């Protein structure tokens, strides 16, 4: 069901702002959006959320093994190679769900978290996608209702990212969003530069490397990751850093954002800046019962085009008063696979495994016989020592200098939940 994507990728990436594709939802666009949502889901599946681990806030896997270990490659025609990890820090106090801090005194990262990755389509992926696609996938947060209550989201001038000539037009962005994107820590061995600098530096390298090919840059993320996707994409286009020179002529690389469950980011001036940027196309996917896209409530403006889904219509899901469920990315992707049009009908149009819904939730109806929160490391990361005792010491077992590692070899996915040794 991907035959049309290589020929239609420009339209699917928003060249015409998705006019005529959203209601009813175009079949190719449905698969296309799910693909980028799954690339964002990799960030959740690879992230160490356990604050009892001294490696909390890190990624379990190396770049070479990330896509295979998270199961992304199985039966997936879209192939990518991960080229860089993104790390972020914070200089202000943020909710724990933003920057996860280990409770261990021996923690490897006190203020630094793994925030996502950059990947480029392989030759095989290029054939299936119609061009050399560069993806910036940002990791999100699991507990939006915690930060909605605990974080007051003051607006802050974003002149450092979007300088304007008239102070009255100065865009303002939520201070938490801006801090995660622009803060740096010179003491960190992982992100002495800011997430902003890391992303722009790697994209500059990749654009130069593939400048003689047809290229696109696609940003994707969920929740906090959706915010970072919009912010980093707008920053790139605003600074004209998506321009490449070919034979003394400038060429603009198209930029697309697929933002799942994104909170609001900035004020009306920020919206005006984003709306003026070309070629920048933003599609926000919003689940009707999810409250996160409506926060913060005051002084913030919504941006981009909107595709609404409603997972309350799914016949596979339990009815729940737990609003956290409706924000979950796997719930979003389930909704994308089955949504029809505005008449409220729900029918799975793509054979996306419904068991993925229960990966981190208890949301599927019991009749489907899928255990709740089934995805976890073997023994929850507890490793047995030589003396017979057990210790929580989960970290990456595969290293980036492992020349035999191949992220396009999906044979290793059967071992993706094995213990992660530290050596």
From Swiss-Prot:
Coiled-coil ranges per UniProt: 194-217
Biased composition (Polar residues): 411-423
CDD domains named in the record: Lipase_3
PROSITE patterns: LIPASE_SER
Record Pfam families: Lipase_3
Statement: the UniProt record of this protein carries the keyword Cytoplasm: yes
Bias type Acidic residues, positions: 401-410
InterPro entries: AB_hydrolase_fold, Fungal_lipase-type, PLA
Superkingdom, taxonomy of origin: Eukaryota
GO cellular component: cytoplasm
Protein name listed in UniProt: Phospholipase A1-IIalpha
Species: Arabidopsis thaliana (Mouse-ear cress)
């Amino acid at each position: 069901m991907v035959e049309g994507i290589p020929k239609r990728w420009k339209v699917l990436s928003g060249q015409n702002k998705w006019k005529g594709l959203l209601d009813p939802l175009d079949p190719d666009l449905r698969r296309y959006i799910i693909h980028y949502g799954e690339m964002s889901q990799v960030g959740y599946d690879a992230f160490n959320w356990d604050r009892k681990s001294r490696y909390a806030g890190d990624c379990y896997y190396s770049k070479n093994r990330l896509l295979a270990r998270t199961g992304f490659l199985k039966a997936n025609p879209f192939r990518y190679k991960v080229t860089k990890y993104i790390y972020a820090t914070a200089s202000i106090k943020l909710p724990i769900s933003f920057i996860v801090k280990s409770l261990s005194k021996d923690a490897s990262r006190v203020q630094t978290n793994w925030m996502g990755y950059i990947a480029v389509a392989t030759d095989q992926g290029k054939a299936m996608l119609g061009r050399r696609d560069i993806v910036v996938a940002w990791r999100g947060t699991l507990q939006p209702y915690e930060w909605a209550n605990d974080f007051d989201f003051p607006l802050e001038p974003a002149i450092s990212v979007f300088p304007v000539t008239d102070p009255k037009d100065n865009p303002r962005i939520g201070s938490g969003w801006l801090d995660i994107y622009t803060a740096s820590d010179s003491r960190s061995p992982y992100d002495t530069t800011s997430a902003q600098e890391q992303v722009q530096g790697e994209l500059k390298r990749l654009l130069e490397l593939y400048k003689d090919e047809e290229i696109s840059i696609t940003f994707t993320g969920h929740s906090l990751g959706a915010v970072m996707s919009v912010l980093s994409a707008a920053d790139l286009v605003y600074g004209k850093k998506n321009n490449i020179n070919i034979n003394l002529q400038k060429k603009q690389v198209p930029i697309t954002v697929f933002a799942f469950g994104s909170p609001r980011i900035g004020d009306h001036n920020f919206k005006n800046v984003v709306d003026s940027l070309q070629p920048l196309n933003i599609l926000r996917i919003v689940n009707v019962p999810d409250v996160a896209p409506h926060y913060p409530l005051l002084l913030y403006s919504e941006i981009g085009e909107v595709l609404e889904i409603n997972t309350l219509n799914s016949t596979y899901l339990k009815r729940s008063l737990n609003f956290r469920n409706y924000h979950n990315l796997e719930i979003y992707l389930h909704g994308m696979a089955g949504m029809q049009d505005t008449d409220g009908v729900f029918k799975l149009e793509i054979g996306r495994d419904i068991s993925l819904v229960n990966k981190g939730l208890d949301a599927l109806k019991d009749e489907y016989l899928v255990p709740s929160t089934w995805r976890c490391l073997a023994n929850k990361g507890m490793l047995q020592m030589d003396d017979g005792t057990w210790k929580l010491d989960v970290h990456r077992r595969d290293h980036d200098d492992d020349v035999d590692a191949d992220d396009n070899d999906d044979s290793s996915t059967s071992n993706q939940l094995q213990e992660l040794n530290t050596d």
